[in-house]
Amino acid sequence: MRQKSWMAGASVPAYLSTHPDIGDRINGIQARLSSFPAAIRNRSFDNRRFKRVQTVLWGRYGDSQAALQRFSGKDALSCMGSGMVLSRRNNVREAAAAFDQALQLAPKDPLVLREAGTFHYRKGDMARAEGLLRQAMQLDKNDFMARFFYARMLDETGRAQQAQPYYTEVLRAVPEAADVHEAYARSLGSIGKTGLAYIHMAYSAIYSNNRKLAERYFKQAKAKTEKSADSAAFRKLDAVYKERKEIWEDR
């Protein structure tokens, strides 16, 4: 709040115009905190997990200039965050150097391994991506994003059959992830499982809230699976589609 007042120039920030005396308010809060028992005041908090989530959010979604300033440190998470931001800005060489530095600093950190592997997957270095993502999965059995990109890497390297169990694992954890359903559908289509492919394209459209595409893929899935071994999978889709259709029609 103080920073806003310092940066405002001649104009008064809207917040301060309705909430004056920020300094007094801060002093009041500090006085109240000092009245707490020592056990509470001196309590230690492990915020390492929070910092890791914060790094991923800033790296993936934050304003790039502000994020790079935030990641000015030399620790592994800062280097990883810088790599994520530089990758978004298409500074591939600088991003690769940042990820390499992060890996040197934390070679056994599954988060660093996953984000570095994802970066190399996106820039087309499948061999490097495979090794990094495999290590990330071994170190963190619950990292479903690492599994998702590992499955996509298998697809890209002509091993779609091997990718199938990874997609199903991810979808058990995040059953409404539209991008996972879409990638899985394309993988299924590449190995000739057309009926299931249309089913998952329909799921992708449903969870993307794309009514027009959902209707189209639902009809195609129905036609392909009506008298096949995939009819049970279609019945599950049918229930989901009908429920979502009711919501769309009530709007």
What spans do the regions from the language model cover?
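Extracytoplasmic and endomembrane cell-envelope/extracellular-matrix remodeling and assembly machinery
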Residues: 1-138, 142, 163-166, 210, ...
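Canonical tetratricopeptide repeat
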Residues: 81, 115-116, 149-150, 183-184, ...
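Primarily a tetratricopeptide repeat
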Residues: 97, 131, 165, 182, ...
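Canonical positions in the second alpha-helix
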Residues: 101-102, 135-136, 169-170, 204, ...
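Structural marker of alpha-solenoid helical repeat scaffolds
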Residues: 105, 139, 173, 190, ...
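TPR/TPR-like (Sel1-like) alpha-helical repeat modules
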Residues: 172, 195-226
